[in-house]
UniProtKB/Swiss-Prot annotation:
This is Orotate phosphoribosyltransferase. Pfam families: Pribosyltran. Catalyzes the transfer of a ribosyl phosphate group from 5-phosphoribose 1-diphosphate to orotate, leading to the formation of orotidine monophosphate (OMP). The lineage of its organism: Bacteria, Pseudomonadati, Bacteroidota, Bacteroidia, Bacteroidales. One of its GO terms (molecular function) is magnesium ion binding. Pathway: Pyrimidine metabolism; UMP biosynthesis via de novo pathway; UMP from orotate: step 1/2. The keyword Magnesium applies.
C-alpha cells in the first residue's frame, strides 16, 4: 500500500470526511444502503488539506499523463479542485454538468475546449463510475481526447473497474477503500469484526442487506 494512500486516508478520517457505520448504514441518493460514506468536499474547508489535494493531484497528472492541454472537473464535487489543479498547471479549465442547463446555450460543458485537446478529468469520488464516464463521453463528443482521470477516492466497486476498463480511461486515485479500512482498523475507528460486513457490502452494494 502506497504512503500517499495511507496518508490521505488518515487525513480524511481525521476531519470526519469518511464515516464507517456497519451497524447503522446510510442511504445513498441511488437508494443503496451503505455502511460507508465519504464526503471529500469537506477537504475544501481545511486550507492545508485543500492545498495537499491540489498538489498531489497535480503531481499525479504530471507523473502519469505527461502532456495535457486542459483539465475538466465533474460537477459539482470536483469543480473546486479541478479549477485549483488547472491553475497550478496553468492550463484551461472546464467543468461538465450531469445534464445540460435548461436556459441560455444549454451547455453540458462549461468553458471552452478545442477539438484535438488532450484532457485529464478530475473527480472527487468514484462509486459506480457512471457520472464520471458520462463526463468523459461528453468531452469525447467535443472532439477531445481524454487521456485519463484522477480522483480523490474510489470505493473500488467491481462494476466501476469494469466500466473504466471498457471505456479505456486510465484511473488514478489519491486513496481507496483498502487504504481507508487499513488505517481505520489500525487507529481504532472500526473493529476487526466490522471488516467482514464492509467487505460483503463492497462486493455487491446494490443488493447488500444490513440485517444479514
Amino acid at each position: 500500500m502506497k504512503n500517499l494512500e495511507r496518508l490521505f486516508a488518515e487525513k480524511l478520517l481525521k476531519i470526519k470526511a469518511i464515516k464507517l457505520q456497519p451497524a447503522n448504514p446510510f442511504t445513498w441518493a441511488s437508494g443503496w444502503k451503505s455502511p460507508f460514506y465519504c464526503d471529500n468536499r469537506k477537504t475544501l474547508s481545511y486550507p492545508s488539506l485543500r492545498n495537499f489535494v491540489k498538489i498531489e493531484i497535480t503531481r499525479l497528472i504530471l507523473e502519469r499523463f505527461g502532456q495535457v492541454d486542459a483539465i475538466a472537473g465533474v460537477a459539482t464535487g470536483a469543480i473546486p479542485q479541478g479549477a485549483l489543479v488547472a491553475d497550478a498547471l496553468n492550463l484551461p479549465f472546464v467543468y461538465v454538468r450531469s445534464t445540460p442547463k435548461d436556459h441560455g446555450l444549454e451547455n453540458l460543458i462549461e468553458g471552452e475546449l478545442r477539438p484535438g485537446m488532450k484532457v485529464v478529468v478530475v473527480e472527487d469520488l468514484i462509486s459506480t463510475g457512471g457520472s464520471s464516464l458520462k463526463a468523459v463521453e461528453a468531452i469525447r463528443r467535443d472532439g477531445c481526447e481524454v487521456i485519463g482521470m484522477v480522483a480523490a477516492y474510489t470505493y473500488g466497486f467491481p462494476v466501476a473497474e469494469e466500466a473504466f476498463k471498457n471505456a479505456k480511461v486510465p484511473l488514478v486515485t489519491l486513496t481507496n477503500y483498502e487504504a481507508v479500512l487499513d488505517v481505520a482498523l489500525r487507529t481504532g475507528y472500526i473493529e476487526e469484526e466490522d471488516i467482514a460486513t464492509l467487505n460483503d457490502w463492497r462486493k455487491d452494494p446494490a443488493h447488500w442487506d444490513a440485517g444479514k
